[in-house]
Amino acid sequence: MKEQAYIPQPLDTSAIVLPKDLDVLTEQLAQNVHAVWAAGRVADGWTYGEVRDDVRKTHPCLVPYDQLPESEKEYDRRTSIETLKCILAQGFTILKQ
């Protein structure tokens, strides 16, 4: 059987604008995205290292979120923002109780 190349088709969320009242949630989700990623790495035997080394299993981003470089925080924020936009695009409402 011939394998077909995977062609990603993410939901188009370009028209979705997140309300400002979701800014705090966006940052909290970004922090959690990092924590989940880091926990997975640590569980697999990775530790902090100044440079990423796949053989030694070291990674410079195995630090608390507030110690990440801004570029890494922005990566996690983009993941959070796209997740929230996808939820809204599907017709859900996000309400804090």
Placement of each model-derived feature along the sequence:
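Alpha-helical propensity feature that highlights long, continuous alpha-helices across diverse contexts
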Residues: 1-97
